[in-house]
């Protein structure tokens, strides 16, 4: 691995070159996200040894959104193991948008992937809990253990999401009717919406990825958060479905597991070595941060990390 000074230099270059790149627009179907300043941008690296390099608005707290699916998948794996997740949710790409109903219809109403909305709600329903609040607190605790104890829900964002999540409610009932929902469907939808409504900064997001890169050990706190054997399962899902409809393009061009969120976050992982996180609100047509993709890809390429290059 390069020295941290080299990594910082590459991070600085990524920010300088792409933090003002044009194109894209904030997500406008969630009022909270529509109002975030679109000129914000940040990029950060956290290594498997806990070293940090960052540039830009790296302390700005933004919505985790779909990147939360990684954390809930991790918890479901801890609770039940890979085989149960594969059987009860699925572990294959859908080839369709992240909120697709057609993807369910085409596959017997099975969600297929924990990293699309249907699969993420199924994951939330699978988490061991005796009540709605216990389910929510366990998911929030997993986000904090992977990233930082400072990660917390935004009541404003949650309210904004809960009043616009009619499509997800419909998906939850479809899953319930097919036997792929493991608690009350509206409870699962509520908790899923909350998990997407937490705020974190770019360094904390990179720490989430670095914990997975480091075989489940948080390199900042030293806690063994996940069983080492679960981390490859998480990264495999990120490779197949993590970047929405652009997952194949990301694997082709960058060659690393990735996950995006409509809050503007991008996370990519170099197994065993580091994680790269980026943030900027304007999104492309499939919901990925325009600048975030450019910054994260630049860092990975400049440091020479691509799983498919010998």
Curated annotation (Swiss-Prot):
It is an enzyme of class 3 (hydrolase). NCBIfam families: Gln_ase (TIGR03814), PRK12356.1 (NF009020). Substrate binds at residues 66, 117, 161, 168, 192, 244, 262. One of its GO terms (biological process) is glutamate biosynthetic process. HAMAP family: Glutaminase. Homotetramer. This is Glutaminase. Belongs to the glutaminase family. It catalyses: L-glutamine + H2O = L-glutamate + NH4(+).
């Amino acid at each position: 691995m390069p020295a941290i000074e080299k990594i910082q230099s590459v991070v600085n270059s990524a920010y300088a070159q792409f933090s003002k790149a044009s194109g894209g627009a904030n997500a406008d179907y969630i009022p909270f996200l529509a109002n975030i300043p679109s000129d914000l941008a940040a990029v950060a690296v956290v290594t498997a040894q806990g070293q940090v390099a960052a540039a830009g608005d790296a302390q700005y707290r933004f919505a985790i959104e779909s990147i939360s699916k990684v954390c809930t998948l991790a918890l479901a794996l801890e609770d039940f193991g890979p085989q149960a997740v594969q059987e009860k949710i699925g572990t294959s790409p859908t080839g369709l948008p992240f909120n697709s109903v057609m993807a369910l219809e085409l596959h017997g109403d099975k969600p297929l992937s924990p990293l699309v909305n249907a699969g993420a709600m199924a994951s939330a329903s699978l988490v061991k809990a005796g009540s709605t609040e216990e389910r929510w607190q366990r998911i929030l605790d997993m986000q904090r253990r992977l990233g930082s104890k400072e990660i917390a829900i935004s009541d404003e964002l949650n309210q904004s999401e809960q009043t616009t999540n009619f499509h997800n409610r419909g998906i939850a009932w479809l899953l319930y009717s097919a036997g792929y929902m493991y608690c009350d469907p509206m409870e699962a939808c509520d908790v899923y919406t909350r998990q997407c409504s937490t705020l974190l900064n770019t360094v904390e997001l990179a720490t989430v990825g670095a914990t997975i890169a480091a075989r489940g050990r948080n390199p900042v706190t030293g806690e063994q958060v996940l069983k080492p054997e679960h981390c490859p399962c998480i990264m495999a899902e990120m490779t197949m479905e993590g970047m929405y409809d652009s997952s194949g393009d990301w694997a082709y061009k960058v060659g690393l597991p990735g996950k995006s969120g409509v809050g503007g976050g991008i996370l990519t992982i170099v197994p065993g070595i580091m994680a790269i996180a980026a943030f900027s609100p304007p999104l492309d047509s499939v919901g990925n941060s325009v600048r975030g993709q450019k910054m994260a890809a630049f860092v990975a390429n400049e440091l020479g990390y691509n799983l498919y290059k010998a």
